Amino acid sequence: MATINQLVRKPRKRKVAKSDVPALQACPQRRGVCTRVYTTTPKKPNSALRKVCRVRLTNGYEVSSYIGGEGHNLQEHSVVLIRGGRVKDLPGVRYHTVRGTLDTQGVQNRKQGRSKYGAKRPKS
């Protein structure tokens, strides 16, 4: 514990909060172009083929972004919108592609949780 005299001489330093999503530069989303679309395997104990794309953003950053939902239409040169949000079992993937915007189609035949996957309300 510092004495009052020590604190008068040299005040306490503020902790600087580090951003979880630096490539967004304090924006809610960013637009970018897919440079590579591929699948990758998660870390232990999970097992799957996770769909991921490498995206070159409008601000010059190049990041990996997860493509959520069943099936997608993305390929190289597709224009996508990305948001923050990491994938816990994929190291280095700290962004999600937003489904149903720009070149990314929404998930087909999605009945529940539609807003997260850009799916329209089905005709009853």
Swiss-Prot record:
Keywords: Methylation, Ribonucleoprotein, Ribosomal protein, RNA-binding, rRNA-binding, tRNA-binding. The modification 3-methylthioaspartic acid is found at D89. Residues 1-22, 101-124 are annotated as: Disordered. InterPro entries: NA-bd_OB-fold, Ribosomal_uS12, Ribosomal_uS12_bac. GO terms for molecular function: rRNA binding; structural constituent of ribosome; tRNA binding. One of its GO terms (cellular component) is small ribosomal subunit. GO terms for biological process: translation. Residues 111-124 have a biased composition (Basic residues). PROSITE patterns: RIBOSOMAL_S12. PANTHER family: 30S RIBOSOMAL PROTEIN S12 FAMILY MEMBER. With S4 and S5 plays an important role in translational accuracy. NCBIfam families: rpsL_bact. Belongs to the universal ribosomal protein uS12 family. Part of the 30S ribosomal subunit. Contacts proteins S8 and S17. May interact with IF1 in the 30S initiation complex. This is Small ribosomal subunit protein uS12. It comes from Marinobacter nauticus (strain ATCC 700491 / DSM 11845 / VT8) (Marinobacter aquaeolei). The lineage of its organism: Bacteria, Pseudomonadati, Pseudomonadota, Gammaproteobacteria, Pseudomonadales.
